């Protein structure tokens, strides 16, 4: 896996380990279970892919937030999807902080340095054992992740992406 913007390269083995560490953190620290929703506000990166597969390992649904939306619009999305946790890229710190303060969440995380009550992504992964969490078999109709979309006339609406859709693609 290559992030052309940062130049970071991650092998599939490292991707699997880091996704397992993220899954372990969510399970052990935030008590995330299958079906829980994890909202992520970040640019595409290798970390983003790790989070996507970390959610998949637990059966959690990753909510891919559109970073182009204003904070008030993002609040509407979070009110709709009711996430258990919020992860944001440090470049979206003001929005991430505003959203994390507006909702009761089991977990909060930023891709930068940890701070009071907010985990840092790299520090969180380093705390975990690194033991592989196997990805269980998923039914075709199980939701893997969710996007929000809207035209010019209305609020963003959730679009579910199932495991079956992923296999067809």
Can you annotate each of these PLM segments?
Residues 1-11, 40, 113-116:
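AMP-dependent adenylate-forming
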Residues 57-127:
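Structural core segment of the AMP-binding/adenylate-forming
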Residues 15, 19, 38, 55, ...:
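Adenylate-forming
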Residues 20-24, 79, 91, 154:
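Solvent-exposed alpha-helix faces
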Residues 8, 25-72:
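Conserved AMP-binding/adenylate-forming
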Residues 9-13, 144-168:
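Conserved AMP-binding A3 loop
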Residues 128-148, 155:
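Conserved pre-ATP/AMP-binding loop-to-beta segment of ANL
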